[in-house]
Every structure is written in C-alpha cells, then in structure tokens.
Curated annotation (Swiss-Prot):
Its main location: nucleus. GO terms for cellular component: nucleus. This is Zinc finger protein 181. GO terms for biological process: regulation of transcription by RNA polymerase II. May be involved in transcriptional regulation.
C-alpha cells in the first residue's frame, strides 16, 4: 500500500497565523512536525526528501509560509468540503471566525493522517505530559467504528476547542462531562454512510457515558454515534495504468492526468498548460518577475523556495546521496533515484506516436517536439528556431564565441560541457564501449550506437529534397545546408562562413597556428587529424592512395558535399 507522504500531514502557517500562536503552541508544533518527518524516514528511508519546513525548523528559523492567492478554480477539494460548514453547536456564543478557531481546524485537518498510526498516537500521549492540554490542537478525536465509510462519503472531523474560547453550554446530545475536562469539542457530521456502535462504559459513579478507546472523549448520551472509522482507512482507488493506490477518487483523477497528458490549466499570458492548478500558480510567478527568496550567501534571488534550496547546495557542496553502483554522489535523493535508472535501464516514459521509451520524462517531452515540429525558442540574432532552450543557449555561443568549459589537462576551452567530457577521453584514452562485430572501442555509448548503424546499414534519416538517406540526424542537418546554402558559422578574423562548426574550427587554426595533432615518431605536428593519418603512412611504409588523373588539370577542386578544397591533384 502506498505510504503517506509528508505533504499529506504537513501544516503550513502564514506569517499572520504564526503570530497568533503562543510560544508553547509553537514549540508543540515544531515537535510534532519533526516527529512526523522522523517517522516517515524510519519507514521509507531514502525515498523521503527532507522538506523545506524541516530545514527551517532545524536551523531555528520560523516556518511560516508566504500567502498565495488562488483563483476560484484552483481551490483544493478539501477546502470546498469545509466551506459553508454547519456546526452542531450554533447556540454557542464563542467566535466562529476567531483566529484560534481557524488555526485549530486547519491543524486538525492536516494532522488527520498523522494521528492514525499507533506509533504516532503513543508519541501524542508523551506530548500530553510535556505540553498538557495544548496537544489537543494537533490531534483529532478518533472513535471506534465497526464499519469503514466509503471514500465518496463526505464527513467532517472532530474539532477540539481549547480553553481560550469563551465557555458556553452545548446543546444535546453533545454535552461533555465537565469533571477534569476543560476542553469542549463538537462532532461535525454530514452524509455519513452507516451508523457505528461506540463502546459504553460506566464512569463518574455509575453514569453511562460514551467513551472512545482511542481519544478518551466522553459523551453523556447512550446513543450510537455516526462517525467514520479513521484508524483503518484504506486506499481503495487504484490506477489501472501503474497500480498506484489512493484514498480519494479526486486524487486518482488528478494522478490519471500523468498518463493521459491532460493539462486543463492554461496560462493566459503565454498559453502554456499544466495538469495541476498548483503548477499554474507556481508558473505565474515567472511572469510577475517576483523573486522573494534570496540566498544569504551570494544574494541571488529565486521565485520559488525549492529553487533556493537547490541553489544553496552549490555553496555547501554537500552530496549525501551516493550511488552504490558507481559511487557517484548527489545533493538530492530525487537526483539519485533518477540516476539509478541509468543502471537499471528502466524506461518509464514511452512515446505514444512511435513507441520509443525514455528514462527521463524531460527526454520524452523533448522527443515529442520532433513529431509536432514545435520550435518555440528563436535566436534573435539569426532567427533560427529550436525545440529546446538548451539548444538555443548552445547555438547563441556561435554568435558570442563564448567558451566557458576548460580542460584542466591542455587548457582547451569548449562551448558546452558535453564537448568537454568528450574531449577529456582523449587524455585518458579510456574506451570502455566495444563493438561486438568488429571489436572497435569507443569512449562513449552514444558513439558505439552510432557506429553500429554502419554494420546494419540503417539510415533512418532521409532528405526530403533529394531523397538521400543518412545514419545520423546530424548528418542529415549538415547535408540539408547544401540545398539551402546556409552557412551559420562565421570566422571572426576574416569573415569567412561555413556550414559546419567543425570546418570553422579547422579554419581558425590557420589564424592561430594551432597544430594539435603530433606524430609520435618524428614529432611533426599538423592542424588536421587526417593530415596526421596520411603522414603516419610514411613511417609505416604504406603508399598513399593514388587518384586517377583527369584530362584537364584544375587549380582548385571543390567537393560540393564537404566544402574541402584541394590545390593540386595527386598522381
């Protein structure tokens, strides 16, 4: 059965609500929240990410949250159940809308799941000895019931009223034994399925009172009370797609959107859609430009508290979550879980159009843009559009010539981290990926996969203009520039343009005089790897390949596919 998450039992206060609590109530709140988190960790282990409110409590900071205004359509399901509630104690003269009443109802609702485990009930009993009657703010009454209600039943929880309310007389049948009990509480009920029988016990000199064996609440009426059984609440709504279970139909419906891809919440500013109202609320902050969360180390501000938490790990450098397979460490447990899929090759996200599966959901979203042709990210310099923001960022470095990733071995710089990682394999000469057909080794799995297409002659990428097919998508893009005449790569020294970035890199060595390819036999250096390969044949005793002579000699022979130029023909 799926476990209760910390968010299911978490209690949030605004700054104003936090100010209403006394110091004793605040201490009690901190104890309960920390114990909630420790209980979840003891059961789930690494699968529980430390919430931000726990971090604040451990640092001795106040855990109040900023108020968020939700539109009417975004109000969570539980809030609508609490609206227009009809209290059975309307004759009471205490203030229904007092701050204390609002806080207690809020705490009781959100501590509902917390109070249902035996371990947590024992912890509450310990707190009673420490904090006395204040503990009742954090525990709903739990009464014994013979039958569990259906999940569709709408019911209210017992609300404990503390002594700071004005005293009043409760109407029947809700009189409470006043002997040794300064707390009054109401039983709120609505549309309950069936009646449950409460144990009758003799108390106060033979007078029969209804007594709950869980909460100890006593009543003066000997009638059976209609209450839900909260101790054994089951998650009876199961997702037919992944098997995950939920306690409410509304939560299952919200979860189902993950599989269907339904996104009913649309941003009016940019048209972006979301599957949850909370995600839309979070997104709207990006348009307002508001960044209320500021890093105390460097002063950088963020629009979301989770972004600030992630950023702060860059200052501490703490990476407590280590992969048992490769030893790689991570600052967040979610990153570790995502990384583990690389070892297990688990691919949860499948494209419904072509059936291709991916390890990460972001990879699936990126892939689906190939089918839709969507390219929302446009370069302001040249107008070229991209399907991913990362591709646009990488492209813009062509115009700025920005290269920020430097190799610590040879001090060579690269415009992207992936290029640096690929380059560093030259120094290590490690090639762990071997082709089973020709025994050729590669330093990257992607390179091996690309090489395997040469054996099976797979060419899935076809030019729509001339019909020529290619093994790799990058080769098709490069070929397509022959038809369009596009040459986006320009040399900042002489202004010459090229269709491929590699051709620009080779050309720039003319200006810099760089010759990175050195012969191990004689020490001669070359600007191109192909020139080094041709030179090494001299040492090996090989004869260079001869080229059939043409009738009319040419000063320049330009090949239309690769743009390589030749000053003379080889005889």
């Amino acid at each position: 059965m799926p476990q209760v998450t910390f968010n299911d039992v978490a209690i949030d206060f605004t700054h104003e609500e936090w100010g209403w609590l006394s110091s004793a109530q605040r201490d009690l709140y901190k104890d309960v929240m920390v114990q909630n988190y420790e209980n979840l960790v003891s059961v789930a282990g690494l699968s529980v990410t430390k919430p931000y409110v726990i971090t604040l409590l451990e640092d001795g900071k106040e855990p109040w949250m900023m108020e968020k205004k939700l539109s009417k359509g975004m109000i969570p399901d539980w809030e609508s159940r609490w609206e227009n509630k009809e209290l059975s104690t309307k004759k009471d003269n205490y203030d229904e809308d007092s701050p204390q009443t609002v806080i207690i109802e809020k705490v009781v609702k959100q501590s509902y799941e917390f109070s249902n485990s035996k371990k947590n009930l024992e912890y509450i009993e310990k707190l009673e000895g420490k904090h006395g009657s204040q503990v009742d703010h954090f525990r709903p009454a739990i009464l014994t019931s013979r039958e569990s209600p259906t999940a569709d039943s709408v019911y209210k929880y017992n609300i404990f009223r503390s002594t700071f309310h004005s005293k009043s007389t409760l109407s029947e049948p809700q009189k409470i034994s006043a002997e040794g009990n300064s707390h009054k509480y109401d039983i709120l009920k609505k549309n309950l399925p069936k009646k449950s029988v409460i144990k009758n016990e003799k108390v106060n000199g033979g007078k029969k009172l209804l007594n709950s064996n869980k909460s100890g609440a006593a009543f003066s009426q000997g009638k059976s009370l209609t209450l839900p059984q909260t101790c054994n609440r089951e998650k009876i709504y199961t997702c037919s797609e992944c098997g995950k279970a939920f306690g409410k139909q509304s939560i299952l419906n919200r979860h189902w959107r993950i599989h269907t891809g339904e996104k009913p919440y649309e941003c009016r500013e940019c048209g972006k859609t979301f599957s949850h109202g909370s995600s839309l609320t979070r997104h709207l902050i990006s348009h307002s430009g508001e960044k209320p969360y500021k890093c105390i180390e460097c002063g950088k501000a963020f629009s979301h508290v989770s972004s600030l938490t992630n950023h702060q790990s860059t200052h501490t450098g703490e990476k407590p979550y280590e992969c048992m397979n490769c030893g790689k460490s991570f600052s967040r447990v979610s990153h570790l879980i995502e990384h583990l899929r690389i070892h297990t090759q688990e691919k949860l996200y499948e494209c419904r159009i072509c059936g291709k599966a991916f390890i990460h959901r972001s990879s699936l979203i990126h892939h689906q843009k190939i089918h839709t042709g969507e390219k929302p990210y446009e370069c302001r310099e040249c107008g070229k559009a991209f399907c991913c923001s990362s591709h646009l960022t990488r492209h813009q470095r062509i115009h700025t010539m920005e290269k920020q990733y430097e190799c610590n071995k040879c001090l060579k710089v690269f415009s992207s981290l992936s290029f640096l990682v690929q380059h560093q394999s030259i120094h290590t000469e490690e090639k762990p990926f071997e082709c089973q057909k020709c025994r050729k080794s590669f330093n990257q799995l992607e390179s091996l996969n690309m090489h395997l297409r040469n054996h099976i002659r797979l060419k899935p990428y076809e030019c729509s203009i001339c019909g020529k097919a290619f093994s790799h998508r990058s080769s098709l893009l490069q070929h397509h520039r022959i038809h369009t005449g596009e040459k986006p790569y320009e040399c900042i020294k002489c202004g010459k343009t090229f269709s491929c970035s590699s051709n620009l890199t080779v050309h720039q060595r003319i200006h810099t005089g760089e010759k990175p390819y050195k012969c191990n036999e004689c020490g001669k250096a070359f600007s191109k790897g192909s020139n080094l390969t041709a030179h090494q044949r001299v040492h090996n005793g090989e004869k260079p390949n001869s080229v059939v002579s043409v009738e009319k000699p040419l000063d320049y022979m330009n090949h239309y596919t690769c743009e390589k130029s030749y000053r003379r023909e080889t005889v």
